[in-house]
Curated annotation (Swiss-Prot):
Cofactor entry: Zn(2+)
Enzyme Commission identifier(s): 3.1.-.-
Keyword Metal-binding on entry: yes
Cross-referenced PROSITE patterns: UPF0054 (PS01306)
Predominant localisation class: cytoplasm
InterPro entries in the cross-refs: MetalPrtase_cat_dom_sf_prd (IPR023091), YbeY (IPR002036), YbeY_CS (IPR020549)
Keyword Cell division: no
UniProt name for this protein: Endoribonuclease YbeY
Top-level taxonomy: Bacteria, Pseudomonadati, Aquificota, Aquificia, Aquificales
Source organism of this protein record: Persephonella marina (strain DSM 14350 / EX-H1)
Residues holding Zn(2+): H112, H116, H122
Swiss-Prot/TrEMBL GO biological process terms: rRNA processing
Amino acid sequence: MNRILINKELGDRSITKKFVKEAVEKILEHLNIDNVEISITLTDDSTIKEINRQWRGKDKPTDVLSFPIDEKPPKYRYRILGDVVISLPYAKKQAEEIGLPYREEIIRLLIHGILHLLGYDHERSEKEAQVMFSLQDEIFENIRSYFSRTTQT
């Protein structure tokens, strides 16, 4: 059992907390990860731009940011993985540009962010990028097929 905390700062009805929680559960299940706490924040471009500027020195919006914590406080049931922040407007625009349904782009960004929390990094080397993106694609296809079968989510 995992603890998934979702903070949705926008009224975008096409991306529900239920959908995000279910997607995160499926991602963690695919990775055989249990008893973790993860925080997902769904926000706007100006908020993610400010976070990106403050923490990465990049004064521009982005699709997803990850902040790994990876600690297990004494007597706390869960290992805390960290926080994933996604800009919904950025994701929607990006989905349109690459020809992916909006909800599938959110799934892709959740996978990407969670992999970063687990220590994967596509910016360190080409080999690490290959490993990360290969795993990301594998998980995406698995989760995508699950959600295509359960379109009532």
